[in-house]
């Protein structure tokens, strides 16, 4: 009976995160050493400006700076090594992702193949071809029906010269008859109008006729009088 479970193996992502935290800690230490070195640099410059210069203090500051630089370089080397491991993990993760993608693609294609195989069995190629042939025949029949319905009735056109001349003569006679009939109608209308005008003149009273005559006579006398003057 086991009372304690074994440690779970870390994944690449977990290992990468651990390295990322390590790099972050290294950067913090390097930044701290840079600040300390900057302070030492300023103190050395201040000591150099003093008169007389205290060389003992300057040497002590230089030794302290050398010690900090050594520690800083250790951290810089560790950072470079850690980042190299991170790069390798990135490469492995990339390769693993590609393999997993290939596996997923294979599974998807396999499942699709099964579905396609199942569905293709439901398709009868012969029936589809027959359906296509039937549709083509229906379309051709429809075109033929349309051509039949849109065609004009056959009219015999084989006429000899005598038949053509006879038809033309009939047309000329028909035109002449129409012209004569129109002339007769026009003449009848004109005669009828003249007869109506004659009747109207006969119905005008004698007084009106005399008045018209007097009016015409007056107009003539006025005209000649103006002319003589």
From Swiss-Prot:
Gene3D superfamilies: 6.10.250.1710
Record carries keyword Coiled coil: yes
Biotechnology: Possible candidate for an effective malaria vaccine as determined by epitope response in sera.
GO CC, any one term: multivesicular body
Keyword Coiled coil: yes
Coiled coil spans: 16-78
Keywords: Coiled coil, Merozoite
GO biological process, alphabetically ordered: late endosome to vacuole transport via multivesicular body sorting pathway; vesicle budding from membrane
Assigned protein family: Belongs to the SNF7 family.
Record's protein name: Putative vacuolar protein sorting-associated protein 60
Record organism: Plasmodium falciparum (isolate 3D7)
